[in-house]
Amino acid sequence: MQRRLAYASLLLLTSQLVAPALLAQATGGATPAPAQTSTTATSPDGQATPQSQTPTGQDGQSADEPVEISAPGVDATAGNEIVVVGRNIPNTIRATPQIVSVLSAADIARTGEGDIAGALTRVTGLSVVGGGFVYVRGLGDRYSSSLLNGSPLPSPEPLRRSVPLDIFPTTIVGSALVQKTYSVNYPGEFGGGVINLTTKAIPAKNFISGGFTVAADDTTTSELGYTYAGGDADWLGFDDGTRGVPQFVRDVQAGKGSGLVPAAQVGQLSNASTTLLQRNNHLPANLSGELSAGSVFDIGSDRLGVISSLSLSNTFRTRSAIQQDSVSPDGTLRNDYRTLLTDNRIVANALVGLGYEFGDNTVRWTNVYIHDTLKQGRGSAAEVYNNASGLRFQQNTNWFERQLIESQLVGEFKLTDALKFDARGAFANSKRNAPYERQFDYLCSARTSNGLPISYDGANGAGGFQCNGAYQVTQRFTPFASIIFSELNENLWTGQADLSYKIDGERPITLSTGYFYQGTDRYSSRIQFNYQTSDGAGTAPGFPYNLYRPDYLLSPDVINNACPLRGQGACTLQLQFSTQAGAYAYDAKLNVHAGYVQAEAEVAAGLRAVAGLRYETAIETVTPVQSATTRLKNNYFLPAGTLTWNFAADMQLRASGAKTISRPQFRELAPQQFRDPDSDRLFFGNPNLRDSELWNLEARYEWFYARDQRFTLAGFYKRIKNPIEQVGFYTGADDRLQTGFTYLPSATLYGAEVELQKYVPLAGLGGDFFATRRLVAIANYTYTKSQINADASCVPNPAAAQGSPGLAGCASGFGPARLLFRDGASLTGQSDHLVNLQLGVEDTAALSQITLLFNYASNRVTNRGPSNLSGTGFQPDIIEVPGIRLDLVARQGFELAGGKFELKAEARNLTRTRYNERQDFGNGRFVYLNRYNQGRVFSLGISTTF
């Protein structure tokens, strides 16, 4: 069995929160543009000082060339209106009092990443977990907000509130920003940071570009994996009707019928194409392609731009995993599985944007389409499991289809020199369809179910477990087969208007106000059917049919005559609707209305202040089928303020304070079961959750000691009331580990981060090769410490069944925090140490780069440890060990036949870092919930622009 590919390139998205009329569209941030040009800045004596001339960068972007940014209140001219002492402070930093990081298109290109999440892993204090979800300073994805051109994005993931950023290719993103301090013109849900992606709108000139990349993973490509046929359009990520949902599933979904599906309807299901798991000893390479074009038209003094982009990627990842668990206080294994999973991921993207500039005004209409499909084959075997009776084999075939569509209209208007108005409205729809999640359970036995011996003539030529007999379905495992249909559909309407007015004077003041609306509607369902014979009680087909492989097991002959030894038609196969714990469907709504006022001014020489107040009211409801509605209605006043002291040339001190909130996600509130294909674990919501409230403090020192070079040092502190945490639990001794949700009385998080960026010219080494080249060194380190408070306060007990009595005098479904959690433990998802290093050589006169990228994240908690089945005490927390990651990226440009070409070579995860999620029971005893090797990934790509 082969191991998992490390091709899940980490992507860290950065987003910016800025007050109206404060942020210039200029470069800066985590990895500044590699070039420099002539500018003018204010010197300490108040005189305009010309900057030295340096070559234009290899990406064709100068240090002061505007970066395209669209977000609430962003002003393209603000950087020219603000007086800051120091010639080296980037315009982005001059223009905003907030702490921001900005990735321009050139910055993103240096990382070599294909999606925005991977590029942002290089930003100070950011890490990516679980396939594209951003953690800022160790706070989970629930504390990060994702915006597209300033408008919120819905998530196509039922287990998450935020959008996985690895579905955004870098080809459609003009810039990415992260703001770590809060400003009131953004939504009140803020914990670690806000991420804003700006799509490309008006090209600088007409162009056509395209590219193609091939990649190989040394644990997946041309190695063993599991696949299944599916439909003819699977390679594009779309179902061709093979997985069409029969009407009887819709009837059950609508609450019709008895829940028993007769044989005639069972036969309507797609069979062999969705059930037959096959070995593929030579999995193909990973392929991706992209095509984009843009045109710009001059209409008098106005400009009209059109831009479009299409891309498609098809990748494979195989994981050979150890999956264990224990329900014992001492860590004695209950289950010890060896699992092989192969993920075939197909991502299709499209963008069409129109932009119109007239005078100082801009209108843009942006349409984004992202379709992300995961086709998964899974086989799992064990001899150690609860009440073991021989070698057990489970097989799964899955299809998870996610889709995101957003259409957005933005207007940015400069009504007068002093008055500016921004308006933006958007509609977004996200879907997740997972039809035909199939599972079959077989037991190896030396005798048939009716007592006949089975002869065994030796190994079958395969490695791993050997069945000394034959696999058969029996009533030993109930159900012997199951099928699940799940759907999610979410609509999101948003609108925002921002008005700012600048009062001129010796010390100008900018006053701003705005209104925000968000309306979200979600419907989610999960319908599970278990196969059984018409005898009921989960019975399996009789001999010899129970020896059949899955597609034969569900053939018409077996469906209509499941007990052949008893005579024709004596029993048939039927489906039993399985009402798992919780609801099979729910509706959810979130309506938010908010308004804010804000003032920004230079209150003294070199001292700049911004202060504001946001009022936000929201009603969040989750209504499960046949269950009571959970309703959260809260109103908040959220103050925020930041001081910036430009006390010396090229040096600044910033201090910020704010109150913010975090609401429970729909999935966290809904008592519905879902399986996460990444962690291969079941999740279950909790209707007893409530909002979290955060108090945020931050101070930061910034020294821009040379052009595009800097040293920064920051400290931060957060106090969280009712932080929501993921908790592992077991519903019984035979049940698999599940993840639930609860909140704690409180938690604190504090830490510091340091960043250094340095360029060293190499011309002194002599020769033409080094004449225009320089060394690039970018390093950052973040230390974070958090502690949860687990006292006697009553908190939701995720392991408690609905309506069950509370623990130690607490209400039903609740228990004392000290009985469920370890006081002083770290928050889930938080690493104490994050290290990023980029070391490279680049040409300042042409496109030529080679960069070594190093990333390290220390251990972090993924789930609080489950409570012991006895009800007393709890197991150790579940810990992920991310370790180190080493990547190498090389880019070389050249011209051929009138076109510009770029050749890019990448080597990812050179250390072959293993994924490791475990519990430590002491004395060297570990339980590995998920452990597998991640392969090295080598890719070669070429792109061209005409």
Question: Where do the model's predicted regions map?
Answer:
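Transmembrane beta-barrel wall of Gram-negative outer-membrane proteins
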Residues: 248-379, 399-409, 639-642
